[in-house]
A protein has these predicted regions:
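Active-site-adjacent structural elements in enzyme catalytic cores
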Residues: 1-116
Length: 116
């Protein structure tokens, strides 16, 4: 989800933009790590820009070997497609990238949704 940035959100999280991207992971291990942190977690994508998103720890290692300290292996992804990106700063909201959440699901939840 792309949302309007609130003043409390640091520049480092938004690259100085007036918007912020927020992801809501479904994976139980990821959610447990975020809950254990006790604060919102800011993190980059799990892939090098321009490369496909990894769907397993092996995929992650292939792309990130030597660039990161560790990988938490929670098993393979169940969806296997890119995350849906929806811009909620616009009226009506605009679907920028389809993914695991379908346009139909978004329209069921939000009503009118434009498509980029």
């Amino acid at each position: 989800m792309i949302l309007r940035r609130k003043p409390i959100v640091p520049d480092a999280v938004t690259a100085g933009l007036d918007t912020v991207g927020m992801r809501c992971p479904a994976h139980e291990v990821t959610r447990a790590i975020i809950a254990a942190a006790g604060v919102p977690v800011a993190a980059p994508s799990g892939n090098t820009s321009g490369r496909p998103s990894p769907t397993s720890a092996a995929d992650m290692l292939e792309d990130m070997d030597g660039k990161i300290d560790c990988i938490v292996d929670g098993g393979p992804c169940t969806v296997g497609v890119e995350s849906t990106i929806i811009d909620l700063t616009l009226t009506p909201p605009r679907l920028l990238r389809p993914g695991g959440v379908t346009l139909e699901q978004l329209r069921d939840a939000l009503g009118e949704v434009d498509v980029d």
